[in-house]
Amino acid sequence: MAGRTPRSVATRLGELDCRVVDALPEGATPELAVVLCHGFGAPATDLVPLAPELLALEGALAERVRFVFPGAPLTLAELGMPSGRAWFHLPPEVLMGQARDWSRFGREVPPGIAAARRGVMSVVDALSTATKLPYGRIVLGGFSQGGMVTTDVALRLEEAPAGLCILSGTLTSEAEWRQKASARKGLPVFQAHGRHDDVLPFSAAERLRDLLVEAGLSVDFHPFEGPHTIAPEELERLAAFLVARLGGR
């Protein structure tokens, strides 16, 4: 990484508190920004350790990319998770691990996702203003619920982002996403999901993949043998995906 240690700075972008990580020279402007949103129940900084790992995997990222990790706006203290955050609340049956109708979940628009979308959009707008990067030079992504929100945002921004990274995410808001995705033909998407995911089933991830592919998005789908997690080989593929975004589509 050109001998520079990544620095991590807490700041507020738009409506959300964020952690910003890069290894750029002091005062340098990034050529690409990557916004990654954590999952339901995780602390706001849960994904921050991914930045130095990705920077170490690909030297080009260290020289040219800035990572931004927004914290979700909702607290889960009332559920016994004082440091847990959420982008939107989940139905009680999901929280209790009861049988879930994932086909129905895929069709429904989750209450609260619109507010979560506005929050992430405010981060993207503030980041674009601060770095002078157009939306087309900002990659969006997230893990689990964070992947749902950033998929929703990527399909609704006025301008297409540089790419979308869905890490163990799932399908929701199906009718709206299908309609919006038709305007995102060619958008590069990296999607990874564990075959043994017992939180968000692999079959639902396949339905999301199929929706995006049918709409003409360029999806790199990476299944791995594992549960609801981020696998080492997934990180390697993600790093390569981000390097490709440096060169444009």
Task: Go through each PLM region and give its residues.
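Serine-hydrolase catalytic machinery in alpha/beta-hydrolase-like enzymes
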Residues: A10-A23, A28-L133
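Active-site signature of alpha/beta-hydrolase-fold catalytic machinery across serine-
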Residues: P49, D152-R156
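Short alpha-helix in the alpha/beta-hydrolase fold that links the catalytic acid
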Residues: P49-A51, W177, P201-L211
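Alpha/beta-hydrolase fold nucleophile elbow
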Residues: K132-G142
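Gly/Ala-rich beta-loop-alpha elbow adjacent to hydrolase catalytic centers
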Residues: G142-G146, T150
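A conserved short beta-strand
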Residues: E159-L171
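Short beta-strand/loop motif that positions the catalytic acidic residue
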Residues: F190-H193, D197
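C-terminal catalytic histidine-bearing segment of alpha/beta-hydrolase fold enzymes
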Residues: S203-R249
